[in-house]
Amino acid sequence: MAIIGTLIEGKYEILKLIGKGGMSEVYLAMDKNLNKQWAVKEIKKRARDKNNEVVVQSAIAEANMMKKLDHPCLPRIVDIIDKEDVIYVVMDYIEGEPLNKVLERDGAQPQETVIEWAEELCGVLDYLHMQNPPIIYRDMKPANIMLQPNGNIKLIDFGIAREYKEHNLEDTVSLGTKGYAAPEQFGGKGQTDQRTDIYCLGVTLYHLVTGKNPCEPPYEIYPIRYWNPNLSSGLESIILKCTRINPEERYQSCAELLYAILHYEEADETYQKKQKKKLYTFYGMLLAAVVSL
């Protein structure tokens, strides 16, 4: 465990502990050279501990994967320090709170706010899927979305993200958060791909807009208007399509999903009724004009 006040590599001063996991701690640190705050993740190495070795290698792979990424909704990795008994990963310090805490405090979020978040999340997932090879995030959930004081969001924790292998039949390891994870994440149903992230995003949007945690009873994704009749039928259709059991029945890309989200009102029953009314009015006026000739 790092000691408060110590310097790492002669420039990162440890200020305080801000997070703790089973085999790692996260600290707030000040870069003495740049006068800038960073988050520093410390992962301990334990000799002759195979589980720890897997954790360390996974952390290094995660850091190296993220180090090459550059997107406004992703934290940056700026330094990886590999010591004899510990690894330090230096990354953006993200102020704010995860959306699961927002849900616990405030309940269901306003539909328009959720739509805005959905657009941002589609954008960052599409960015990941466009990498070469594509990166499949696999762990979309409110706990991994940080809401910053300025209202922007950041996607965090790439612990189970993986690079898509074109010739693999299925994932080598079954990982995911039950309730949010797609069926194919638990093996025997093919390799996870971009449609897996679309499923997880659909469940996340469901939780955000209804306040109903998919990890709690009734453990099912109901149509969102079952919980709140005032919600959009267009958004309801989008979430239901995202969360189809069969990946072939979901949106096939985040670009396709984003288009649907941007035009969700056009699939709304109220909108369609208004458009039909306008059309009937137009035809009525046109008919009246023809008759008067």
What are these regions (language model features)?
Residues 25:
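Conserved N-lobe ATP-binding subsite of Hanks-type protein kinase domains
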Residues 47-68:
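AlphaC helix of the eukaryotic protein kinase fold
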Residues 79-80:
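A short, aromatic-enriched beta-strand patch in the conserved N-lobe beta-sheet
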Residues 84-98, 102:
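Conserved short submotifs of the Hanks-type protein kinase catalytic core
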Residues 117-118:
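Activation segment signature within eukaryotic-like protein kinase domains
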Residues 123-135:
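Protein kinase catalytic-loop region centered on the HRD/HxD motif
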Residues 176-266:
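C-terminal lobe helix-coil module of Hanks-type protein kinase domains
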